Amino acid sequence: MWKLYGHDRAHDALRTALLARGFEENDPSTLMVAAVDTVLAALPAAVSGPLAARQLTTVRDLDAYQQIWDDVWPGAPNARYVNDYKSRIDQHDPGILFYAGFAPDGEAVTSGYMFHHPGDPIALLCGGTTKAAWRRQHAYTLMLAVRAQAAAKRGASHLAVEASPESQPILARLGFEPLSTLMFYEKHIAD
């Protein structure tokens, strides 16, 4: 996988080279940034509902994470990513934190993770994923809230998100502003 930002130098030449080497463009995203304090101030009225969020701290916890991804993106190489995440948890990597939101019956319905090393000014929020039946019920916002709170506790002053078109309006309401465009390039290699 390769990420190409709109502000990268030689953007057009890089894009041409990636396409010539068999990489395919995925859907475009937007890099959005906000001050942690701005997001936290906008959240109290936005987060409500029956879901309970918790940090995922064990390899077994990430099975729930994969269930969410498999439901939302069937056929995607979810196991490859989740196995990498399991390895990072097993190695006690302090730079990545995983969260999930659970319905009252215990079903994992939303998830997200955060890259942040304590002391860094920016935390990158990634993987915001919600099962279809739980959309428009503040599940995505709940995942934003728990990660923003964790980033604040770890000393981050700003949050960054590589936002899909679906996420951008939610993020804008919480104070995020677009900074650049982003395109993912992926080369499919046969197993």
Predicted features, each with a name:
Residues E24, S157, E177:
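Short acidic/polar active-site loop segments enriched in Thr and Asp
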